[in-house]
């Protein structure tokens, strides 16, 4: 498939997700980076979003809880180019009932080539990167070209 450029604006649309055993780590990370995060538009799965909003005092657009479809909602937003960055503190030591949804979210984030941090160290690197605070370009699949080719 051919690719095309997508511009990520200075104001990023950031998805925040955490498995149950990692929620407090993500909340603490959000508190640490509150000033930077407040400059962007934040989305989160339901429980995580409500906890971050309450404990870190950040405005969050909360979707459904992950097991109830929130991961799928985020995947849809990524495919529609409405999410620029995914911060997902996942628990590699515990399976969750919605593992297929989590895998689908990771897959779609990879397909649409958005920056993804899956642990605190990577999230720290990402948020302190010069690219985070400026307009930047990423390569994404050329879906329009793909569709035209398929419909010949």
UniProtKB/Swiss-Prot annotation:
GO molecular function, one term: methylglyoxal synthase activity
Record-level GO cellular component terms: cytosol
GO biological process: methylglyoxal biosynthetic process
Keywords tagged on the record: Lyase
CDD domains in the record: MGS
Pfam families reported in the protein's UniProt record: MGS
Active site as annotated: 71
Catalytic activity: dihydroxyacetone phosphate = methylglyoxal + phosphate
Residues in MGS-like domain copies: 1-152
E.C. numbers: 4.2.3.3
Binding site for substrate: 19, 23, 45-48, 65-66, 98
Top-rank lineage group of the source organism: Bacteria
EC primary class: lyase
InterPro entries named among the record's database cross-references: Methylgl_synth (IPR004363), Methylglyoxal_synth_AS (IPR018148), MGS-like_dom (IPR011607), MGS-like_dom_sf (IPR036914)
Family under the similarity heading: Belongs to the methylglyoxal synthase family.
Function as written in the Swiss-Prot or TrEMBL entry: Catalyzes the formation of methylglyoxal from dihydroxyacetone phosphate.
Protein name: Methylglyoxal synthase
Organism: Pasteurella multocida (strain Pm70)
